[in-house]
């Protein structure tokens, strides 16, 4: 009976040790993957198209504003046959950014009063 109990404890210990090593390997792989994604994002961020500039070459290259990414909007100018695409911020997102800025400012005042 003691032998079975000792064998069971040994088996559980080995199993937990091997699963911990596997989790460490997965965590390391996740960290490496996350770092590579961050590096790609930084490289991509350097090539973004500023607001009101032509984005017809790459419609997903618009820069980010404080909270939201600008959108490549295409239209035909009056009396023209050529399509023009520029990076623009939709009005509803512009208003949301203004509201968030005012809320942040108001929150700072409340923190100053009570903090």
Swiss-Prot record:
Keyword Signal tagged: yes
What does UniProt give as GO cellular component?
A: extracellular region
Recorded hits in Pfam families, A to Z, give: Toxin_35
Major subcellular site: secreted
| Keyword terms, alphabetized | Disulfide bond, Knottin, Secreted, Signal, Toxin
Cystine residue pairs: 48-63, 55-72, 62-87, 74-85
State one molecular function term (GO): toxin activity
Residues that make up the propeptide are: 21-44
**Keyword Nuclease, does the record have it?**
no
What InterPro entries does this protein's entry cite?
Answer: Spider_toxin_CSTX_knottin, Spider_toxin_CSTX_Knottin_CS
Q: Where in the cell is it found?
A: Secreted
Segments spanning the bilayer are: none
Which interval of the chain is the signal sequence? 1-20
Q: In which tissues is it expressed?
A: Expressed by the venom gland.
Report the domain remarks. Answer: The presence of a 'disulfide through disulfide knot' structurally defines this protein as a knottin.
Could you say which protein family the record assigns here?
Belongs to the neurotoxin 19 (CSTX) family. 01 subfamily.
Q: What is this protein called?
A: U3-lycotoxin-Ls1k
Query: Taxonomic lineage per UniProt?
Result: Eukaryota, Metazoa, Ecdysozoa, Arthropoda, Chelicerata
